[in-house]
């Protein structure tokens, strides 16, 4: 039997199977946001586990003059987060008070300062993400006067932050040397790791 739907301006949008598209869309966006937050938390943890394996001097070590230290990358991430996520839904993500160039000059000099800036940036981002309401997904977001959907603006940062966190981990491995402990699957252990994971299919958390 063919179903016939008559939709007027006041009717909810309906799928061919009889579902409410608007309701389904809201549920989908909540699932998306939950997934995004989970991924951000994962990469945040990777960086923090790296901080824990690097001594204070190593946090500010540079391979050469053109390279960034872990401290500089943290400055950049914190600066970006504060700029992008402050008034996320109502103002351009590139704030006039941000000094991006200064983020790549050594300003942070201690581990305590580093962690303070780090947490300040992440707190700003998570607070912004958790404040997104159902109607906000329809809004336009601007970054340097370039229009984005809310999803695209989030995805932009979801690609940007892991890029720099990968740099943090790489520098951490160079600094720690033989004392480095793998943050994922140790070399030569993929087979045993996978065997353990597949003992209880469907019950394991994602791991890369």
Language-model segment annotations:
Residues 40, 44, 51, 118, ...:
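Hydrophobic alpha-helical core bundles mediating ligand binding, dimerization, or RNAP-core interactions
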Residues 37-41, 48, 56-102, 143-208:
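Short, contiguous alpha-helical
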Residues 12-13, 17:
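Ser/Thr/Pro/Gly-rich low-complexity, intrinsically disordered segments
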Residues 105-141, 149-163, 167, 206-208:
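Acidic/histidine-rich alpha-helical segments that form the ligand environment
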Residues 18-22:
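Glycine-biased, low-complexity coil/linker segments
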Residues 29-39:
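Extreme N-terminal tail/first-helix region
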Residues 23-24, 28:
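Intrinsically disordered, low-complexity segments enriched in serine/threonine/proline/glycine
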